[in-house]
């Protein structure tokens, strides 16, 4: 299934899209209203959209049909052509142009953040340098994180496209930063449900509300603590992509790995086996193993990582006898601890402590 893309462009915008089916055979679910909004952008720049529409294979009759739909690939082609031709990634929605490369600059500015929370805060703050017509904020209340878009100017005929684009862009960027799918708890849109409201279920899977006070995205706040998994090389490669980053690389939800690590580190006595870990996380052991496998991890592998980190810390920072270190790390005997430590590191605990390892 292909997802309706509200504003897709190469080099700068990250819009999750399932590419399991080729564009030619994918269903057309993206509303033609988005294409009509891009035509309005051309009109505001006093330019013709003919070339962009031709590249996207959108006929004038389709453009005039209020019920017409297009594929995500058509929308990507149209938006990319328009943003480059107009040199405006804001598509004329704001009081000033957003030159080609603006959103790539924002992505780079947040790349050095230690975790997703700080990266998104920077991204929202830096967005105000591009335009003050909208204000983006990230907030967290209890277990829920919210990205909000406050309109500070009349976006006119481009309002729906602009708000949908902003939400999709920040969600796609967040997924890309941590290399993980981020399920949405709810998306809020501050306008009545349009005739093509069904398309929004593809754009924002999860609970969806129209007529909210402002545009919002809500997701589990635990994702904010996840570290960024991208570097400058990744960014350069991403900026060379001709299509938005698809959702497939993010089908593995890395949040569970983080939760398992925390459980193993904070509750070692309760996490001797899979049943104990599963009980702490309120999932079945079958679900635990299956989801960890989907994320490319295993419970034993995570236990070894946590044990090794704990062992290194105790060996380096304390003078506890080796038997006590072994017990603190979760081994019943010093011998089994020595054997495991050698397998992990290639050296013995004693040599590691002395600095000879």
Identify the residue ranges that each predicted region occupies:
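N-terminal low-complexity or simple alpha-helical regulatory segments
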Residues: 1-147
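Short, contiguous, pocket-lining structural segments
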Residues: 44, 158, 162, 252
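Short hinge/gating elements
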Residues: 104-110, 152-156, 224-225, 245-246
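Extended mid-to-C-terminal alpha-helical interaction segments
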Residues: 194-195, 199-357
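Hydrophobic alpha-helical core bundles mediating ligand binding, dimerization, or RNAP-core interactions
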Residues: 79, 120, 167-170, 243
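Short, conserved glycine- and acidic-residue-centered signature motifs
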Residues: 71, 163-166, 304
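DNA-contacting interfaces and partner/effector-binding or oligomerization modules
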Residues: 135, 139-226
């Amino acid at each position: 299934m292909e997802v309706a893309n509200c504003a897709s462009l190469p080099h700068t915008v990250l819009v999750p899209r399932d590419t399991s089916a080729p564009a030619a055979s994918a269903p057309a679910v993206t509303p033609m209203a988005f294409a009509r909004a891009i035509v309005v952008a051309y009109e505001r720049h006093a330019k013709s959209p003919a070339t962009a529409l031709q590249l996207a294979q959108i006929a004038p009759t389709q453009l005039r049909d209020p019920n017409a739909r297009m594929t995500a690939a058509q929308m990507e082609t149209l938006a990319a052509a328009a943003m480059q031709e107009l040199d405006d990634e804001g598509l004329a929605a704001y009081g000033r142009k957003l030159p080609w490369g603006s959103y790539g600059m924002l992505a780079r500015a947040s790349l050095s953040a230690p975790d997703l929370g700080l990266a998104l805060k920077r991204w929202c703050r830096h967005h105000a340098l591009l335009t003050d017509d909208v204000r983006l904020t990230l907030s967290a209340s209890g277990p829920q994180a919210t990205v909000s878009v406050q309109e500070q100017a009349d976006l006119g005929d481009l309002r729906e496209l602009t708000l949908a684009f902003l939400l999709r862009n920040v969600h796609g960027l967040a997924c890309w930063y941590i290399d993980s799918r981020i399920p949405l708890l709810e998306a809020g849109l501050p306008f009545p449900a349009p005739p093509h409201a069904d398309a929004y279920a593809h754009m924002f899977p999860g609970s969806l509300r129209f007529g909210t006070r402002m545009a919002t995205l809500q997701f589990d706040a635990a994702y904010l603590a996840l570290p960024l998994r991208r570097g400058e090389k990744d960014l350069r490669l991403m900026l060379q992509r001709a299509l938005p980053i698809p959702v497939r690389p993010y089908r593995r939800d890395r949040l569970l790995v983080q939760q398992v690590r925390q459980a193993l580190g904070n509750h070692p006595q309760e996490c001797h086996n899979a049943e104990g870990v599963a009980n702490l996380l309120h999932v079945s052991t079958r679900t635990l193993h299956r989801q960890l496998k989907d994320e490319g991890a295993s419970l034993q592998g995570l236990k070894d990582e946590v044990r090794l980190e704990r062992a290194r810390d105790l060996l380096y920072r304390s003078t506890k006898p080796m038997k006590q270190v072994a017990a603190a790390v979760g081994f019943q005997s010093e011998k089994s601890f020595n054997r495991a430590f050698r397998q992990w590191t290639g050296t013995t605990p004693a040599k590691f402590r002395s600095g000879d390892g």
